[in-house]
């Protein structure tokens, strides 16, 4: 760090220069001697020694004072030497301080670095003469101080501090205003001059300077001694090589620098302190190269502790760089480097400072307090460290050593032998720090050699290049023994006796050089590798056995035996094998694939860039012309021939290069014709000449395919070649492209995109069928592709910009290739280059990759410039017509561009038309042939489904998985689709093998080699037990097997199994790439191959792989998508197969697998029919319900085993008999005679008789019998029949022959669902498991809930009864039931009754969920018209009552339905209503079309109708059923409400909900309740409710609770605000009530209440209670009016009447009633004037006839009273319209009042109050203020009128105040709606998702599992409603059964 002294760095330099000039030792005198200590006396000098100073960055050699000088003017020679030393010098300078002060070093690092840079700059720029003090003063305009120093001054001013104190006052006196910085600079310059002029330099300073000068000249430094400049060392004649006494490995190895530094600091008994001069220039004196060498050897500190270090002797690049970086550390011959600051801590100045041993501080002696006369001896800590208590801790080997007669040589060499790591007498290398024992060298040395000795590392020859990889190693012969040349000097007594001189063998490594081909591989010594590729060498050591050379690795895969035979026959092969092949180099790697490019060197010689076979492009290498490689000349000729062909004559082979080429001219490629020579529309009867020349022969159907493709090309029709897998689509495509080329139609280029795994196969086929094509495979990593782009795309060097980044190709550049083969991924990744080329033809293999037009592949490929497109696919219809449409859209977007139109066109016509029309569309575009048509003699294939039992271990895990996931499975817990999928995957794993779970895998017995123990592996899985028996028999019979599994981990287990069984096998999965994959296939298909099994993963093994040598396929676990399985077994059943193929599909009985297989079969049925998008897609569209059904399959039986304890002990397993059935049924059991007696659940007939399946030898033999009938999948055949019309390319499409037998085509079948299935099955197991877990976790035993198992068994029985009708489809109670019409307590009898009603229909199965009949979609048997009629009925009457089927609710269109079908449809309809999702979607989740259903409107209507119905029921028992007394039959009141309700047999009437048995249907009130209740109050606008997920829910109580909460946050003020808005709008706007309709929708509560109470449902809590804070007159009026009304009725009609709607005065209804009744009573026209009575009968009419059926109501004699008020208007023309409008408006008002009543009822029951700080309350306070102000100043108006002027003035002020208050209130009112807090959605209030709420509400009312706390406790929702909301008591349950029934009735 520079001090304030500007030129501080220059200060000591001049001081040192003087000393140097006097005492410098010349290079000649020094003579390059290193035995420095021989030339100096041993006695110590009086003063502490001051060692020469190396720069502060050089490492510390010991504690000593130091000064430094440097020569200002170096000779050129010296500068050269300096440069040389800098490049060769080492950075190895051991330091003591480094370790001790690591922390401080880090802090100082940045400072030092900056300082180093400054110094380097200084050095680089040459040495500048510092300015003198006079110059500085003159420059700054200061007065100089001319003071002559006397001798005394020179004696007294011995340090800078004293000098400064003396001179500073003098300068300040002359220059009073001198800045401090300039003062310090001048003082520095003065001190420098003073020191330079000091005549007394011969004393201590002189001694120190001499030492500095001498030491800087030498490199090996002795302990510091004062010498006189006169002493000149004499050169020695010859010297022995350097030796030293090392330390053994037992000695603690310290940092080498620390050890050496102590020796160097020990010139005296007392170690001198370290001194340093701040800021001394790091320029060093010149030194000879020899002197630098020991310094050089210090290179690598780490090398001391490691056996292998980079060569310190070679001037390698890395070392130069390193030296340059650390140049400052080695500049001075021998200083030391410390981390100390270079200025005094006290005065911040440089100079001679002493360094603290325990911290980085430094001090002047005079700056210490107290001052020190001289440096203290030994270790010294500064005042700061002493204060902090930090002490220097001595190290073990810091003890002072006794000094001998001569000084110890200072040494940087290793303390131990590099080979054996032991101490003793060591031979030291003169060029590096290595040390060796003589006997450890190879060969050993007999004695210490004379002169300079370099170690093996320094004499090791450099490598010829960079090593890319190590291929092999071997032992070499020992080196020849070392011959002793000169007699050695005396051996030191410590040397061990010499060993025998034989050398030891060394390792040699066979290496591949980077940038060179395998032809250049060679052997290198171990030491070379160790020195130049340390990391690679170490890694190789770590991974390989370094005692025994690796066995020979024949990379070609040949066995030793084969190799020997070939060597005997082929001497060239023998030579190559010995030199290359045995070391793992494949012969292909040394064969030229093709020459890519050429270049000329300066001499004009040509070099070729060669691509080697089977190696990627990034391993291309440049080779010279003359290298001897087989076929090299031919390939050169081919290269030049291709250039000539593409570029013309100019590009032919240069004449000077023509050598052997002349002989090869005849092989030149034939140029394609420029014009077409053959008409492509003419058919070939036999294959063309250019195919004959390849030696191949096309099958007749392939020739037909070629003709069809050429014809389509001529017509410009893009095509799909859809031949079945295995018919050679690849060959037909290649021959087609080749024909275009050879016949002159097109020269390319052609783009072929294929899956990566098949690209190698494409290459081979191109080589075979199109030899003249130049085919480039564009795959690989970035480097490889970069090489391809630069060399294979064009002949021009600059056609494409080089580098890894992809650029476009220049326009109109000659393309080099004919065909580019690439993968799907690179089409998108390297779009820039590929998209810039104009392609003559595009071929996409496995084109179903284009089935989604949203995929990137589709979009990118669509943007390419392509003349003609050809798609290849074996499965053109994988899932649905939508995918086929996308293929056609890709082919011809101008023709196929309207997806909706396409699908619609094929959705509404019958199948025959559809097929015909599709054929007309597809005919020109698609050709499809089947193996069955093409190869009449091709062996058949038989597919058998083999049902397998779970092993005991699998059963344990299967149960565990279900139990552990009970909460996710139990729909009440709200399990989602993802979690169900996860559970299903776990169960599939369990069916495969329990070891797929980490827990089981860890516990499994293992073999020493890490694989599983075979016997336990087999016993753990039922499938493996069967596989073991099957494989044994198959092997004996000579069959070969393919085993497919989806899971690669399962393939790992199968590998262990096959190893255990001793079978040889191959394996392919997603991780095995193209090359390795093809090799494995080739090995398996090779004649006489030993491999018996081939393991494949279903998806990776499904593409373009030919394994026709196998004849047995075992599908270990089925894929979700059946097409993947078909592709899998088509690997074996293809061209070349000459045996019958047996396919065994393993399916675990009664498990998810069995169900999945059935679902997969159903998907296959969709393949040839489905045209609805989305219905047939893959697992993505699995609904939660489908997943749930799959998971349930077989579980009951599994857990029944637990309960029954496997009761079937008396039955012994018998031999299974394979029943080979068609797989159409989905469950073909190659099964067994089965034990009978089990009755598994579900409707799967296959399983019903089955129990444990046991396979014995007889069963296995039967299973493997190949004479069984072929059972090709019928669905598959159907699909193929559908596509069969494309099998003959006659250019006109044949019509479909088949006729559809079945009238109804099943699209989708609804699954049966029991809501409580998991609850009953798993609850007990789950609780037990939780208890065990809690006990294990130390939570104590759970208190068991008392369960009455009798009840449970009854419930179970009931459940079974319910399911007895095939689990009737409408029992989807969990999500679809509605409680509006269900009354749980009395439900049992109702249930039995309904069961009796159902009996007749029980045997008749329900129609399928979705079917197509005559082109029209049916849903559960309801056609479009019936569905519309059902919806209209819902919109008219609300929810169907529970006994709707017996009432006349059923309209004419629905009367043909059975009750079972009707109920199922109601259930489905409600489920759809409650399904969340956008109304805009085309279908519901299960695929049923929405048909424009607006969920919000329907739910709103259901809600409104429910409120109306309940209000009428409330008063029905009083008012009867007739509006006028003369119509009433006798004693109508005597009838029960239920009877009263449906009176007119001709009119459909909803039955009273109170009567209904609990069935899974209804949802009316529930929905109403949920429907829009929450947000509507504040705004007059209707909003669709998010909380409407109401699914028909079976638990009345639950729903009530939830709903309550749901409504709970009402308040008076909100209501008041409603009044303000609504009262104004109620009559005027017909829409407004609609808005309110939604409110009722949310009020299920009342309904539910009806359900729970079988009596009249008067659930209206006292209105006044609700209005505590703001009592309204209306309420009292209401009661009074009712009383009056009652009296009048008695008088007038003796007819009792009661009706009220307690709207709390929030609507105008009561005001109207009051006025109307007053008028009616006063005039006596009780019937003629419309009032309360009419309103009641209007509502009753709506309940009977439906919503807004005004005319029907008026025509009904029961409601005659409604016509009375209009009699006087009959004569008017618009009489009817007027009457209907009035009724509609009046109904809206009633509707509004009903909504508010329901809200108030809930608010009252929940004791809700409004926060006094709420804006609404503030408005109330303002109103009171206005009233108060007005009343208190009433008298003013009289006085003012009386002429009182002061009163008049006051009156004006008061009026102003009132005006202000009123305007404020007006402003507040307008803001009020937005300020009133809206009720949050029910989901937010309950803190649950909509799904969770719905599933929670699915519990049945009597269900003991209802957990009330979840809904009852107010904590759940208290905080949602603000601070002042009070719930129904402290955590109590909202139970509406406890509420008062109906206080709003008059006449009691």
Curated annotation (Swiss-Prot):
Residue interval(s) of motif DEAH box: 845-848
List N5-methylglutamine occurrences by residue: 1388
Provide one Gene Ontology biological process annotation: regulation of cell differentiation
Give residues where Phosphoserine occurs: 1552
- Histone-binding: annotated span: 341-651
Which cell locations does it reside in?
Nucleus; Chromosome
- Bias (Basic residues) occurs at 95-114, 250-268, 319-328
How is it modified post-translationally? Methylated at Gln-1388 by N6AMT1.
Compositional bias (Pro residues): 1547-1561
Q: Which GO terms describe its cellular component?
A: chromatin; heterochromatin; nucleus; NuRD complex
GO molecular function annotations of the record: ATP binding; ATP hydrolysis activity; ATP-dependent chromatin remodeler activity; chromatin binding; DNA binding; helicase activity; histone binding; histone deacetylase binding
The alphabetized UniProt keywords are:
ATP-binding, Chromatin regulator, Chromosome, Differentiation, DNA-binding, Hydrolase, Metal-binding, Methylation, Neurogenesis, Nucleotide-binding, Nucleus, Phosphoprotein, Repeat, Spermatogenesis, Transcription, Transcription regulation, Tumor suppressor, Zinc, Zinc-finger
Q: What residue spans carry the Basic and acidic residues bias annotation?
A: 559-569, 1598-1625, 1633-1650, 1657-1672
The record lists the catalysed reaction(s) as: ATP + H2O = ADP + phosphate + H(+)
**Primary subcellular site in the record, as a coarse category:** nucleus
User: Metal-binding among the record's keywords?
Assistant: yes
| Entries under Pfam families matching the protein | CHDCT2 (PF08074), CHDII_SANT-like (PF06461), CHDNT (PF08073), Chromo (PF00385), DUF1087 (PF06465), Helicase_C (PF00271), PHD (PF00628), SNF2-rel_dom (PF00176)
Give the tissue specificity: Expressed in brain regions enriched in neurons and not in regions rich in glial cells (at protein level).
Q: Where is the Chromo domain?
A: 495-552, 590-651
Segments carrying the region annotation (Disordered) are 1-136, 228-268, 281-336, 547-569, 1206-1250, 1349-1409, 1521-1566, 1595-1692
Present the record's domain note: The PHD domains mediate specific binding to histone H3 unmethylated at 'Lys-4' and may preferentially recruit the protein to transcriptionally inactive genes.
Q: What is this protein called?
A: Chromodomain-helicase-DNA-binding protein 5
């Amino acid at each position: 760090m520079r001090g304030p002294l500007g030129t501080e760095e220059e200060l000591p330099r001049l001081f040192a220069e003087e000393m140097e000039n006097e005492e410098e030792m010349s290079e000649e005198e020094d003579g390059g001697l290193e035995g420095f200590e021989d030339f100096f006396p041993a006695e110590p000098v009086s003063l502490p020694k001051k060692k020469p100073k190396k720069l502060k960055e050089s490492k510390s050699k010991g504690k000593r004072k130091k000064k430094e000088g440097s020569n200002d003017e170096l000779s050129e020679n010296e500068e050269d030497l300096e440069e040389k030393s800098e490049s060769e010098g080492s950075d190895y300078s051991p330091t003591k301080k480094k370790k001790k002060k690591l922390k401080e070093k880090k802090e100082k690092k940045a400072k030092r670095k900056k300082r180093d840079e400054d110094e380097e700059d200084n050095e680089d720029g040459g040495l500048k003469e510092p300015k003198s003090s006079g110059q500085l003063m003159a420059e700054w305009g200061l007065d100089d101080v001319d003071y002559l120093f006397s001798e005394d001054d020179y004696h007294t001013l011995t340090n800078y501090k004293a000098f400064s104190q003396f001179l500073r006052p003098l300068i300040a006196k002359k220059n009073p205003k001198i800045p401090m910085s300039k003062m310090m600079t001048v003082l520095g310059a003065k001190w420098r001059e003073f020191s330079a002029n000091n005549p007394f330099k011969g004393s201590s300073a002189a001694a120190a300077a001499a030492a500095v000068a001498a030491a800087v000249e030498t490199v090996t430094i002795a302990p510091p001694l004062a010498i006189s400049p006169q002493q000149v060392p004499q050169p020695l004649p010859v010297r022995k090589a350097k030796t030293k006494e090392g330390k053994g490995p037992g000695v603690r190895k310290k940092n080498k620098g620390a050890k050496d530094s102590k020796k160097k600091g020990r010139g005296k008994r007392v170690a001198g302190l370290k001194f340093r001069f701040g800021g001394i220039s790091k320029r060093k004196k010149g030194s000879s190269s020899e002197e630098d060498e020991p310094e050089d050897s210090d290179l690598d500190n780490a090398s001391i502790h490691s056996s292998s270090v980079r060569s310190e002797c070679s001037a390698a690049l890395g070392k130069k760089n390193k030296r340059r970086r650390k140049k400052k550390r080695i500049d001075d011959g021998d200083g030391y480097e410390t981390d100390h600051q270079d200025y005094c801590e006290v005065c911040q100045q440089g100079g001679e400072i002493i360094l603290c041993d325990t911290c980085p501080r430094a001090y002047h002696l005079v700056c210490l307090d107290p001052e020190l006369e001289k440096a203290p001896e030994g270790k010294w800590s500064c005042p700061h460290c002493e204060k902090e208590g930090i002490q220097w801790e001595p190290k073990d080997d810091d003890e002072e050593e006794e000094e001998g007669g001569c000084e110890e040589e200072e040494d940087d060499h290793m303390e131990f032998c590099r080979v054996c790591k032991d101490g003793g007498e060591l031979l030291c290398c003169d060029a590096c720090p290595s040390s060796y024992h003589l006997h450890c060298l190879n060969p050993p040395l007999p004695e210490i050699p004379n002169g300079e000795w370099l170690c093996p590392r320094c004499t090791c020859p450099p490598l010829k290049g960079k090593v890319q990889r190590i291929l092999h190693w071997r032992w070499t012969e020992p080196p020849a023994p070392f011959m002793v040349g000169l007699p050695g000097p005396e051996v030191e007594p410590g040397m061990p006796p010499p060993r025998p001189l034989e050398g030891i063998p060394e390792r040699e490594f066979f290496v591949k050089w980077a940038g060179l081909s395998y032809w250049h591989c060679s052997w290198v010594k171990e030491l070379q590798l160790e020195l130049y590729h340390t990391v690679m060498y170490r890694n190789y050591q770590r991974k390989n056995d370094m005692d025994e050379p690796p066995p020979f690795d024949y990379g070609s895969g040949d066995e030793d035996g084969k190799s020997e035979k070939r060597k005997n026959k082929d001497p060239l092969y023998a030579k190559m094998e010995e030199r290359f092949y045995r070391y793992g180099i494949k012969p292909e790697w040394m064969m030229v694939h093709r020459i890519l490019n050429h270049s000329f060197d300066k001499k004009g010689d040509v070099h070729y860039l060669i691509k080697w076979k089977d190696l990627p492009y990034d391993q291309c290498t440049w080779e010279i012309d003359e290298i001897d490689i087989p076929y090299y000349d031919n390939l050169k000729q081919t290269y030049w021939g291709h250039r000539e062909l593409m570029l013309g004559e100019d590009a032919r082979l240069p004449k000077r290069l023509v050598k052997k080429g002349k002989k090869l001219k005849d092989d030149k490629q034939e140029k394609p014709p420029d014009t077409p020579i053959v008409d492509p529309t003419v058919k070939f009867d036999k294959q063309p000449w250019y195919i004959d020349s390849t030696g191949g022969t096309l099958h007749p159907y392939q020739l037909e395919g070629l003709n069809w493709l050429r014809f389509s090309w001529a017509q410009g029709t893009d095509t799909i070649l859809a031949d079945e897998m295995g018919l050679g689509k690849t060959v037909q495509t290649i021959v087609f492209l080749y024909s275009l080329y050879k016949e002159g139609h097109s020269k390319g280029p052609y783009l072929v995109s294929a899956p990566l795994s098949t690209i190698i196969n494409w290459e081979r086929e191109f080589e075979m069928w199109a030899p003249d094509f130049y085919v480039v495979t564009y795959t690989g990593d970035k480097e490889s592709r970069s090489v391809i782009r630069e060399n294979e795309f064009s002949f021009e060097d600059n056609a494409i910009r080089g580098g890894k980044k992809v650029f476009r190709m220049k326009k109109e550049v000659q393309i080099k290739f004919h065909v580019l083969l690439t993968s799907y991924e690179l089409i998108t990744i390297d779009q820039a280059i590929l998209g810039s080329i104009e392609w003559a033809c595009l071929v996409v293999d496995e084109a179903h990759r284009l089935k989604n037009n949203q995929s990137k592949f589709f979009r990118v490929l669509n943007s390419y410039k392509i003349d003609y497109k050809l798609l290849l696919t074996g499965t053109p219809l994988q899932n649905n017509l939508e995918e086929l449409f996308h293929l056609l859209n890709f082919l011809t977007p101008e023709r196929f561009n309207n997806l909706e139109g396409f699908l619609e066109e094929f959705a509404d016509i019958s199948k025959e038309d559809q097929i015909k029309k599709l054929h007309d569309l597809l005919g020109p575009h698609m050709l499809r042939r089947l193996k069955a048509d093409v190869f009449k003699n091709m062996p058949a294939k038989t597919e058998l489904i083999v049902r397998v039992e779970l092993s005991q271990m699998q059963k344990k895990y299967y149960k565990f998985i279900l139990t552990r996931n009970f909460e996710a499975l139990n729909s009440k817990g709200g399990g989602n689709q993802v979690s169900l999928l996860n559970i299903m995957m776990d169960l599939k794993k369990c069916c495969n093998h329990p070891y797929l779970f980490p827990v089981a895998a860890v516990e499994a017995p293992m073999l020493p080699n890490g694989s599983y123990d075979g016997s336990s592996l087999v016993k753990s899985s039922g499938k493996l037990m069967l596989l073991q028996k099957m494989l044994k028999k198959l092997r004996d019979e000579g069959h070969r097997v393919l085993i497919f599994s989806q899971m690669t981990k399962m393939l790992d287990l199968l590998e262990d199994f096959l190893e255990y069984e001793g079978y040889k096998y191959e394996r392919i999965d997603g991780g095995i790439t193209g090359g390795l994959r093809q090799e494995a296939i080739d090995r398996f298909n090779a004649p006489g191959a030993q491999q018996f099994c081939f393991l494949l993963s279903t998806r990776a093994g499904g593409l373009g792989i030919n394994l026709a040598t196998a004849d047995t396929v075992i599908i270990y676990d089925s894929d979700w998508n059946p097409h993947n399985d078909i592709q899998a077994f088509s690997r074996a059943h293809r061209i070349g197969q000459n045996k019958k193929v047996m396919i065994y599909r393993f399916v675990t009985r009664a498990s998810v697998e069995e169900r999945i297989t059935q679902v997969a079969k159903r998907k296959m049925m969709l393949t040839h029919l489905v045209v609805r998008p989305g219905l047939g897609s893959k697992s993505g569209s699995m609904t939660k319900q489908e997943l749930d059904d799959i998971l349930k399959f077989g579980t009951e039986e599994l857990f029944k085993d637990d309960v029954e304890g496997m009761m079937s002990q008396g039955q012994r397993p018998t031999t299974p008999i394979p029943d080979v059935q068609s797989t159409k049924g989905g469950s073909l059991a190659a099964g067994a005679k089965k034990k009978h007696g089990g009755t598994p659940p579900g409707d799967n007939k296959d399983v019903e008789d089955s129990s444990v399946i046991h396979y014995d030898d007889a069963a296995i033999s039967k299973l493997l019998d190949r004479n069984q009938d072929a059972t090709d999948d019928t669905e598959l055949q159907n699909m193929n029949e559908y596509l069969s019309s494309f099998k003959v390319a006659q250019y006109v499409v044949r019509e479909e022959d088949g006729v559809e037998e079945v009238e109804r085509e099943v699209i989708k079948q609804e699954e049966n669902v029991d809501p409580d299935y998991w609850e009953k099955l798993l609850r007990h197991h789950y609780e037990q498991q939780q208890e065990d877990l809690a006990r294990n976790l130390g939570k104590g035993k759970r208190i068991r809930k008392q369960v009455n198992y009798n009840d449970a068994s009854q419930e179970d029985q009931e459940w079974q009864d319910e399911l007895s009708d095939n689990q009737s489809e409408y029992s989807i109670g969990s999500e679809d039931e509605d409680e509006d019409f269900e009354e749980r307590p009395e439900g049992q009898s109702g249930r039995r009754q309904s069961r009796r009603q159902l009996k007749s229909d029980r045997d008749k199965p329900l129609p399928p969920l979705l079917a197509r009949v005559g082109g029209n979609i049916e849903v559960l048997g309801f056609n479009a018209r019936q569905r519309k009629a059902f919806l209209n009925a819902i919109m008219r009457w609300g929810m169907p009552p529970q006994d709707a089927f017996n009432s006349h609710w059923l309209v004419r269109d629905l009367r043909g339905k059975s009750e079972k079908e009707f109920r199922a449809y109601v259930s489905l309809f409600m489920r759809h209503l409650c399904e969340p999702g956008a109304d805009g979607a085309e279908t519901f989740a299960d695929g049923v079309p929405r048909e424009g259903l607006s969920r919000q409107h329907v739910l709103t209507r259901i809600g409104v109708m429910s409120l109306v119905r309940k209000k009428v029921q409330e008063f029905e028992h009083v008012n009867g059923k007739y509006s006028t007394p003369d119509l009433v039959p006798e004693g109508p009141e005597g009838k029960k409400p239920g009877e009263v309700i449906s009176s007119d047999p001709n009119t459909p009437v909803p039955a009273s909900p109170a009567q209904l048995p609990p069935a899974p249907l209804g949802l009316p009130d529930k929905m109403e309740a949920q429907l829009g209740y929450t947000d509507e109050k504040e705004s007059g606008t209707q909003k669709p409710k998010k909380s409407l997920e109401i699914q028909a829910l079976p638990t009345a109580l639950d729903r009530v609770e939830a709903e309550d909460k749901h409504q709970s946050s009402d308040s008076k003020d909100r209501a008041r605000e409603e009044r303000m808005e609504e009262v104004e709008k109620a009559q005027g706007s017909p829409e407004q009530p609609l808005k309110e309709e939604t409110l009722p929708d949310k009020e299920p509560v009342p309904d539910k209440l009806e359900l729970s109470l079988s009596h009249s449902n008067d659930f209206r809590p006292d209105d006044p209670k609700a209005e505590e804070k703001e009592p309204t007159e209306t309420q009292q009026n209401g009661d009074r009016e009712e009383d009056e009304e009652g009296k009048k009725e008695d008088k007038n009609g003796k007819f009792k009447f009661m009706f009220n709607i307690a709207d709390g005065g929030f609507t105008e209804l009561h005001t109207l009633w009051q006025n109307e009744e007053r008028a009616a009573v006063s005039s006596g026209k009780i019937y003629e004037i419309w009032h309360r009575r009419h309103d009641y009968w209007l509502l009753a009419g709506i309940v009977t006839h439906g919503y807004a059926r005004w005319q029907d109501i008026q025509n009904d004699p029961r409601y005659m009273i409604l016509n009375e008020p209009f009699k006087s208007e009959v004569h008017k023309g618009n009489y009817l319209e007027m009457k209907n409008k009035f009724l509609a408006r009046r109904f809206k008002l009633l509707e509004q009042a009903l909504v508010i009543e329901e809200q108030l009822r809930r608010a009252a029951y929940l004791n809700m109050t409004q926060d006094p700080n709420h804006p609404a309350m503030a408005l109330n306070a303002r109103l009171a203020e206005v009233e108060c102000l007005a009343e208190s100043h009433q008298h003013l108006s009289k006085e003012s009128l009386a002429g009182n002027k002061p009163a008049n003035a006051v009156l004006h002020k008061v009026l102003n105040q009132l005006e202000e208050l009123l305007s404020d209130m007006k402003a507040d009112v307008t803001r009020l709606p937005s300020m009133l807090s809206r009720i949050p959605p029910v989901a937010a209030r309950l803190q649950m998702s909509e799904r969770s709420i719905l599933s929670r509400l699915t519990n049945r009312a009597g269900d003991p599992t209802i957990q009330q706390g979840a809904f009852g406790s107010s904590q759940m929702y208290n905080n949602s409603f603000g601070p002042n909301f009070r719930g129904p008591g402290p955590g109590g349950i909202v139970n509406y059964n406890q509420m008062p029934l109906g206080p709003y009735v008059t006449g009691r």
